[in-house]
Amino acid sequence: MPPKPKILTVGEILVDFVSTESGKTLQNAPAFLKCAGGAPANVAVGIARLGTESAYIGNVGDDSFGRFLVSEMNSAGVETSGIRFDPLHRTRLAFVSLKKDGDRDFAFWESDPADEHLEFGKINLDLLKRAHIITLGRSYF
């Protein structure tokens, strides 16, 4: 039997392209660094880094960015058996910069991303049964 995840996170997951220079708008950013992102996915990684068993449920596109996200989550110690590769929708992308006033500037790419197509009937119910705590990024069902 697999180990019992203590905390299960459900929600959006995306690739952030973060400006390599702060104080620049997206228009003026010279380059971007590819990072795993999405608040619920970040929570799952943080839980794992604190040494607590962590699992994640969500959708990614069946594309290179989706595979990148699963690899990053695995590397962080998050159980990823709850991630579904959606063959019909792409992984969400976000471009992020930190403006001079300290506020973040976002631009999202993908009008109908995979993470918005999480269906209750297609999720890994075993993860739900094994979780002590479940956190939701937003309401999907």
Residue ranges of model-derived segments:
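Glycine-rich phosphate/adenosyl-contacting loop at the front of the ribokinase-like
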Residues: 1-79, 118-120, 135
